[in-house]
Structure formats: structure tokens, C-alpha cells
Amino acid sequence: MITWLDPQDPFPPVERALGPASDAPGLLAASRDLSPQRLLLAYRQGIFPWYSEGQPVLWWSTDPRMVLAPHRLKISVSLRKTLRRILRDPDWEIRVDDDFVAVMQACAMTPRDGQLGTWITDDIVAAYGSLHRLGLAHSVETWYRGERVGGLYGVALGRMFYGESMFAHRTDASKIALAALCGFLERHGVTMIDCQQETDHLASLGAEPIPREQFIAHVRQTAAEANISPWRFDKSELTRWTSQASTEL
């Protein structure tokens, strides 16, 4: 049985999350509370929300945990060529926090294999919008000829980035944003991006599962460090993947 959380209640230990033999491995608790304070408490303990419209807020701590080391991002030969072209072409831009809510809404409207509807509900948009206004949630956006064509968003605490979702309206547009983000994070000493759950797509980008215990230990160490400031970069971060040898598919 999972724990029901009232607003003042702490999270239970992550070891109490449902195990792999259950119908919902990793499910830890449920609540109605989705305040910024609750979200920050969750992230600092390796917990994240994921639920559908009409459900209570469901809190998860999966084991293993899917993570991506920024320096191990996999760049295919074709994507490397695209990045080189983008660096030369002024029609392409990387913008940070241009319109955070618009990025969330674009992610919400993107069809996902095996998913009906979206977990990015109005309440989720409002909650993460509050974190964005606090300077703790950010969007990385790929623009082409004045139009947002892809991007991603996530939460940044200390030297830890928690990726939430991405979208692409042009081929590789979300990968372009991720490549820029990884270049920026690597320069600032971030060694792990939380990807939450295992998927083939994340694995193709270089993400790997690690034991939850290892993930939690890393979060406790890095989330307590000073936040990155300023959170600003542009497409020049893409040179990380074009000017020197890096992992290729």
C-alpha cells in the first residue's frame, strides 16, 4: 500500500516504493499537494511526480534510475553534420527561457508511443511555472527563422539537472536543444541529468540505468551545491560536439 501525503507530511523513505513485481514499480506516495515546496522536497530526495488527468498526484522513485552524463551524449554522424550547419546558419538559434510555459504546452501536445493523453496537466504547468519564476526550472529552445521548432524543460538544483520532457516540430530539433544543454552543463561541472524512466529513445542518446541508491547519493551531494548562475547560453555550446571527438552512434 502506498502512502497518502497531507500537505504537512514528509515523503516516506524511497525504499518503500513499490517493487518490480508490482503493477506500478517505483510508485511511492500520492497526494493532492503540488506546491513548489513539495516539488523541491521531492527532487532533493530523488522523487518525481507523474500522473494522469483525474488522478491524485502520484510520486515515484524508480529503481533503477535512468540518467545521462552530459559528456556521454551520443551524437550520430548525421546529427554532427546538422550541428555544424546550424553553427554557420544565422537562421538557427538556441534560446533559453524564451517562453517556458509554451515549451511545456508543446511537450504536452506531443504524441507519445504507449501513452493516451498527457501527464503534463494544467496543474503541472502551473506548478513548474512557479519553479521557473523562482529561477529553478528552465527551458532550452531550438528556433528556426523566428519559430520555435523544438526544445525541452527541466529543473536545475545545485549541480543537478532533472529533465522532464522534450518536443520536436522539425527533425532532430529536440536533440539540438539537448546537445546545447549538455555542453552548458558539462562546462559548469554537472555530471548527471536525471531522465527518470528507462526508454529506448533515452538509451539511444546515451542514457543508462543506475541503481537508485547510487542516484540518491549523487543527488544528496550535488543538489546541495550552489545553483548555476547565470542560466544563459546560446548555440555556441554546440561546438562541444563538432570541434573534438565525441561519442558517435
From Swiss-Prot:
Keywords of this entry? Acyltransferase, Cytoplasm, Transferase
Q: State the EC number(s).
A: 2.3.2.6
- What is the top-level taxon of the source organism? Bacteria
**Positions of disulphide bridges:** none
Q: What is one term from the GO cellular component aspect held by the record?
A: cytoplasm
Q: Where in the cell is it found?
A: Cytoplasm
**Which transformation does this protein catalyse, written as a reaction?**
N-terminal L-lysyl-[protein] + L-leucyl-tRNA(Leu) = N-terminal L-leucyl-L-lysyl-[protein] + tRNA(Leu) + H(+); N-terminal L-arginyl-[protein] + L-leucyl-tRNA(Leu) = N-terminal L-leucyl-L-arginyl-[protein] + tRNA(Leu) + H(+); L-phenylalanyl-tRNA(Phe) + an N-terminal L-alpha-aminoacyl-[protein] = an N-terminal L-phenylalanyl-L-alpha-aminoacyl-[protein] + tRNA(Phe)
Q: Which GO terms describe its biological process?
A: protein catabolic process
Recorded GO MF terms: leucyl-tRNA--protein transferase activity
Cite the Pfam families for this sequence.
Leu_Phe_trans (PF03588)
Q: What class of enzyme is it?
A: transferase
**Is the Acyltransferase keyword given for this protein?**
yes
Its job? Functions in the N-end rule pathway of protein degradation where it conjugates Leu, Phe and, less efficiently, Met from aminoacyl-tRNAs to the N-termini of proteins containing an N-terminal arginine or lysine.
What's the protein name? Leucyl/phenylalanyl-tRNA--protein transferase
Which organism is the protein's source?
Cupriavidus metallidurans (strain ATCC 43123 / DSM 2839 / NBRC 102507 / CH34)
